[in-house]
Amino acid sequence: MLKQLKLGTINDLAILLSLRQELTMAKQNLQPYKRYPQIPDYAKYSKLVAVAEERYEMAQKKLGMEIISFDFRTNEVKFTIMNTGEMFVVRKVLNGLTNKFEWMVM
């Protein structure tokens, strides 16, 4: 059975994915400084991680969605809608007719 998603849901998912990517990048920037927390850059990057985590959590609550997993190789995202508990798997694929990337429900 193919589940239909509203365009707003896909837009919300894109926002949530960008915030998750921001959080991932902030954590990667902090990684080299974890061994030496006395370095001033550690405080700067740990604050960026805290802000990114807060923004991501707020967006999850506001949008009512939670990303379960994201596979960079296949561009496949598994997420749930918190209100209904429905789980969706979407994949970003290239449409051969329009030559644009589109989200397809799996």
Feature roles, as predicted:
Residues 44-60:
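Short, non-transmembrane alpha-helical segments in secretory-pathway proteins
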Residues 16-19, 23-33, 52, 59:
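Non-transmembrane amphipathic alpha-helical segments
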Residues 65-93:
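Amphipathic, interaction-prone secondary-structure segments
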Residues 97-106:
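A short, surface-exposed interaction/processing loop segment used at functional sites
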Residues 1-24:
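Short, charge/polar-rich alpha-helical segments
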Residues 9-12, 38-40, 95:
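Intrinsically disordered, low-complexity coil/linker segments enriched for acidic/polar
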Residues 31-42:
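Charged, low-complexity interaction regions
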